[in-house]
C-alpha cells in the first residue's frame, strides 16, 4: 500500500509511520512524497547488498541437490525396470506441497553418500491438511532400513502424535539393512531404541492419529509388520507384496516352492488374509486412495471430523422399499440400499474383496462422515462367517477410535453354522464383532432392512447393544431364528413320524403361526424397535438422528480394559 505524506516529513518520521501502519494493517507500506519514496516495509525494504550467499552455504545447497536426486544411476534404472515412480515424484503425486524434511543429511558422508539414508521423513499438506510422512527411497540400497533410517522413523512418528496430525507411510523397502558395516558387534536391530521401537510406537499411537500405509514393493520379514500396523493399507498391483519370509526362505525352511505374488501379493492379502484394504492398479490411483481415506478421518482422535457439502444420493431414496424383496431368502445387492441413503459419490468401501458376505466402508450422509456395516444378501445370504466377523470388528473399532458414527444395515440369517466354521473359530472370532459393537461409544444406528435372526442382530447392534436408534423398515423380521429353523427345532421329533404330505402341510401351518410372532408391526407395538418407518424416509431419519447425536458424550474410562483382543 502506498501512503503519501508532505514533502517536509523527514525520513526517520516516514519510516516510523510506515512501520506503525504495516503492523496495524498487516501488509507492506510505502511512504512517498512528491520527490519519490521515503520509506518502505516488507521485502522491498531489504538491502540487496546484504543478500550475500557464502561459499559454505553454496556447498550445502549443492549437497542438498545431490541428496534430492536419490541413489546412484543403477538404482534409478532398477525402479524403471520395476515400473516404479521415483520416491520424490511419488510424494509430488500425493502432496499439495512438502514443507520440510528431517534428516536429509543422514548417512551422507564422504565415505557413504547414502542420500537421507534411504528414508525420507517430513511434513506436508494434502488437500490443505497437515500430514507427516515417511517414504523409502528404493534407489538407495533398495529402500532398506539402516540405523539412521530407524532413528528418523521413530522421531517422525513421535512428532506427528505431538503435533496431532496423520502419518502417511509410503513403504518400498526390502527390510532391515543387515550388512556388517551397518552395525557394531552385538547389534541386531533389536535394541531398546532400535527397529522394535518403530513397531512399539505404531502400537501405542494406534487410535491417536490416523496411520495410512501404501505398499509399493515387496516387504519381507519383520518390516512387513509396518504396513499391517497401519489403520489402512493400500497395495499397488503388480509391484507390491508382503510376507513374513521371502520365497527363498520359505523354500529353504519348508520345501514349498512359490513366487512372491502367490506368497503375499496384493490379491492374496485382498481376498484371503484381509490384510489389505484396497488394491489399486497404479501409483496415481494410490495417491487418489490416500486423499479419499483422509477425507473421512480427523486429524487426531479428539479433533472434529471433516464435513463436506451435502449432495443428494445417486439414486432416489423413495425407491428403497422396492429394492428389498418380500421373500426373506431372495437375494439383492446391499449396495442398492447404500446408493439410496448416502451422499452421491461418497461411498468408499474397505476390504471390498474380502469376506464379501459383509460390506464395510465410509460414506457421507448430509456431508457427515459415517462408517457403514452391512450384511450382503447376494453372497451366502448375508450369513456372518469368521472372516466377516473379524472384518467388521476391526472396522467398528477403527470408527470408534476416530469418533466416526456407525450405521448398521442388518439383513442376516445369523452366524454361519457347521463343522468348517467351528474349526475356523466362528465363536472365538464372532465374539470380537459383538464385543466391538458393544463397546463402541460413537453414535450407532441399527437399520433392520429384512432378516435379523439369532446372534446376528447382536453383532449388528440390535436393541440390546447400545444403539442410539433401532429403525425397522416394513420388510423387517426380528427373531431368534428363521421360520424354517424354528419349526424344525420345535417340532422335529413330531414331524419325523408324519408322512411326506402331512409333514409339508404341518410345516406351512406352523410357519404361518410363527410368522405372527415376528410380525414387525406387532414388535413395533411392543417397542422392540424405536421406530417403524417407510423405507423411503430412511435417509431423512438418519440425517436427523446423526444431527441429534452429533455431540454424543462418551463414557470416560480408566486404563482398565476388557479381555477380548482384536
PLM segments and residue spans:
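Ligand-binding clefts of soluble mixed alpha/beta catalytic domains
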Residues: 36-566
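Short, non-transmembrane amphipathic alpha-helical segments
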Residues: 11-25
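A short amphipathic beta-strand at an alpha->beta junction
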Residues: 23-36
Amino acid at each position: 500500500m502506498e501512503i503519501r505524506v508532505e514533502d517536509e516529513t523527514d525520513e526517520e518520521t516516514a519510516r516510523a509511520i510506515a512501520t506503525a501502519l504495516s503492523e496495524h494493517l498487516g501488509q507492506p507500506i510505502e511512504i512517498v512524497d512528491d520527490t519519490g519514496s521515503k520509506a518502505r516495509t516488507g521485502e522491498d525494504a531489504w538491502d540487496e547488498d546484504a543478500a550475500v550467499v557464502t561459499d559454505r552455504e553454496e556447498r550445502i545447497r549443492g549437497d542438498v541437490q545431490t541428496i534430492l536426486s536419490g541413489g546412484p544411476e543403477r538404482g534409478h534404472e532398477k525402479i524403471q525396470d520395476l515400473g516404479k515412480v521415483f520416491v520424490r515424484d511419488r510424494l509430488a503425486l500425493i502432496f499439495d506441497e512438502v514443507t520440510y524434511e528431517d534428516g536429509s543429511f543422514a548417512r551422507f558422508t564422504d565415505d557413504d553418500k547414502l542420500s537421507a539414508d534411504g528414508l525420507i521423513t517430513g511434513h506436508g499438506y494434502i488437500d490443505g491438511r497437515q500430514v507427516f510422512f515417511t517414504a523409502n527411497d528404493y534407489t538407495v540400497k533398495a529402500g532398506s532400513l539402516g540405523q539412521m533410517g530407524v532413528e528418523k522413523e521413530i522421531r517422525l512418528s513421535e512428532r506427528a502424535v505431538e503435533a496431532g496430525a496423520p502419518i502417511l507411510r509410503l513403504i518400498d523397502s526390502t527390510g532391515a539393512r543387515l550388512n556388517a558395516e551397518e552395525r557394531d558387534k552385538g547389534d541386531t536391530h533389536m535394541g531398546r531404541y532400535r527397529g522394535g521401537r518403530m513397531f512399539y510406537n505404531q502400537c501405542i499411537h494406534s487410535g491417536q492419529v490416523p496411520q495410512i500405509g501404501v505398499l509399493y514393493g515387496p516387504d519381507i520379514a519383520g518390516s512387513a509388520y509396518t504396513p499391517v500396523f497401519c489403520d489402512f493399507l493400500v497395495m499397488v498391483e503388480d509391484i507390491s507384496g508382503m510376507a513374513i519370509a521371502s520365497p527363498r526362505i520359505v523354500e529353504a525352511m519348508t520345501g514349498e516352492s512359490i513366487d512372491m505374488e502367490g506368497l503375499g501379493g496384493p490379491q492374496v492379502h485382498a481376498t484371503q488374509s484381509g490384510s489389505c484394504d484396497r488394491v489399486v492398479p497404479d501409483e496415481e490411483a494410490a495417491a487418489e486412495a490416500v486423499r479419499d481415506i483422509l477425507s473421512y478421518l480427523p486429524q487426531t482422535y479428539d479433533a472434529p471430523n471433516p464435513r463436506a457439502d451435502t449432495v443428494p444420493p445417486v439414486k432416489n431414496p423413495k425407491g428403497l422399499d422396492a429394492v428389498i424383496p418380500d421373500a426373506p431368502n431372495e437375494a439383492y445387492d446391499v449396495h442398492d440400499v447404500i446408493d439410496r441413503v448416502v451422499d452421491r459419490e461418497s461411498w468408499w468401501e474397505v476390504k471390498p474383496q474380502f469376506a464379501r458376505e459383509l460390506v464395510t466402508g465410509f460414506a457421507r450422509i448430509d456431508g457427515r462422515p459415517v462408517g457403514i456395516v452391512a450384511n450382503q444378501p447376494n453372497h451366502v445370504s448375508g450369513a456372518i462367517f469368521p472372516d466377516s466377523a473379524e472384518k467388521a470388528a476391526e472396522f467398528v473399532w477403527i470408527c470408534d477410535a476416530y469418533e466416526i458414527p456407525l450405521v448398521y444395515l442388518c439383513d442376516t440369517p445369523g452366524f454361519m453354522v457347521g463343522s468348517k466354521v467351528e474349526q475356523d473359530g466362528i465363536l472365538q472370532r464372532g465374539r470380537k464383532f459383538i464385543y466391538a459393537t458393544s463397546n463402541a461409544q460413537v453414535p450407532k444406528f441399527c437399520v433392520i432392512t429384512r432378516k435379523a435372526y439369532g446372534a446376528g442382530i447382536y453383532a449388528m447392534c440390535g436393541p440390546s447393544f447400545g444403539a442410539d436408534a433401532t429403525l425397522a423398515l416394513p420388510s423387517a423380521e426380528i427373531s431368534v431364528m428363521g421360520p424354517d429353523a424354528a419349526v424344525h427345532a420345535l417340532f422335529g421329533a413330531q414331524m419325523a413320524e408324519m408322512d411326506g404330505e402331512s409333514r409339508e402341510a404341518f410345516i406351512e401351518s406352523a410357519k404361518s403361526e410363527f410368522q405372527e410372532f415376528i410380525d414387525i408391526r406387532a414388535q413395533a407395538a411392543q417397542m422392540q424397535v424405536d421406530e417403524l418407518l417407510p423405507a423411503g424416509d430412511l435417509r431423512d431419519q438418519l440425517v436427523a438422528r446423526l444431527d441429534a447425536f452429533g455431540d454424543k458424550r462418551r463414557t470416560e474410562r480408566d486404563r482398565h480394559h476388557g479381555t477380548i483382543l482384536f
